[in-house]
From Swiss-Prot:
GO terms for cellular component: cytosol. The lineage of its organism: Archaea, Methanobacteriati, Methanobacteriota, Methanomada group, Methanococci. Keywords: Antioxidant, Cytoplasm, Disulfide bond, Oxidoreductase, Peroxidase, Redox-active center. Pfam families: 1-cysPrx_C, AhpC-TSA. It is found in: Cytoplasm. NCBIfam families: PRK13189.1. Homodecamer. Pentamer of dimers that assemble into a ring structure. It catalyses: a hydroperoxide + [thioredoxin]-dithiol = an alcohol + [thioredoxin]-disulfide + H2O. InterPro entries: AhpC/TSA, Peroxiredoxin, Peroxiredoxin_AhpC-typ, Peroxiredoxin_C, Peroxiredoxin_TDXH, PRX_1cys, Thioredoxin-like_sf, Thioredoxin_domain. Thiol-specific peroxidase that catalyzes the reduction of hydrogen peroxide and organic hydroperoxides to water and alcohols, respectively. Plays a role in cell protection against oxidative stress by detoxifying peroxides. This is Peroxiredoxin.
């Protein structure tokens, strides 16, 4: 089972867009990707999730991030389901869906729980442009995902790459609003510099270990 900080396993997958090599396909394009699993095609909760992901697809792309789905259904089932969504709900699913019909990748990624049958749970993997797994979330089969939180997670991880941390409920934190946290000082000189930066107005803060600032683009 993989963990945060590990490289995404190298695999070749069959998708609704043809064969893809992961994570190579996205690394070569210099893109992040969000891989998410769903329990099964032609199921109500999964259908609502796919529509919700598609409606935010442009938002993910603006973050240099692609989407790719996965279940243990066959590719023919994926194709018919995507056609059904277009016909009945008038939504074009533009991102690929992996047909992991033997469950090999799902098992490797810890998407199948022995307590939840043979179908995948609702997993989310955020992978950066180097192929490193940056975040993993698991939802039970009976609970649909919050897509705004997945978008927020990608934004927060990309903000972390700029050297900042993000507070609870960012960018709507009760105290800091959209401001971001400067990592705590780790020695006495840095502590002194932080206090001086807060005093001069270069940073804001409650103490030397709790400093924050506006996010600089």
């Amino acid at each position: 089972m993989v963990v945060i900080g590990e490289k995404f396993p190298e695999v070749e997958v069959i998708t609704t867009h043809g064969k893809l090599k992961l994570p190579e396909h996205y690394i070569e394009a210099g893109k992040w990707f969000v891989l998410f699993s769903h329990p099964g095609d032609f199921t109500p909760v999964c259908t609502t999730e796919f529509v919700a992901f598609q409606k935010r697809y442009d938002q993910f792309r603006s973050l240099n991030t692609e989407l790719i789905g996965l279940s243990i259904d066959q590719v023919f089932s994926h194709i018919k389901w995507v056609e059904w969504i277009k016909e009945k709900l008038d939504v074009d699913i533009e991102f690929p869906i992996i047909a992991d019909d033997r469950g090999e990748l799902a098992v490797k990624l810890g998407m199948i729980s022995p307590y939840k049958g043979n179908n995948t749970v609702r997993a989310v993997f955020v992978v950066d442009a180097t192929g490193t797994i940056r975040a993993i979330i698991y939802y039970p089969q009976e609970v649909g995902r919050n897509m705004d939180e997945v978008v927020r997670l990608v934004k927060a991880l990309q903000t972390a790459d700029k050297g900042y941390a993000t507070p609870a409920n960012w960018p709507e934190n009760d105290f800091l609003n959209e401001k971001v946290i400067v990592p705590p000082a780790n020695n006495m000189d840095a502590r002194k510099n932080r206090l001086e930066a807060c005093k001069s107005g270069e940073l804001e803060g409650y103490d030397w270990w709790f400093c924050y600032t506006d996010l600089k683009e």
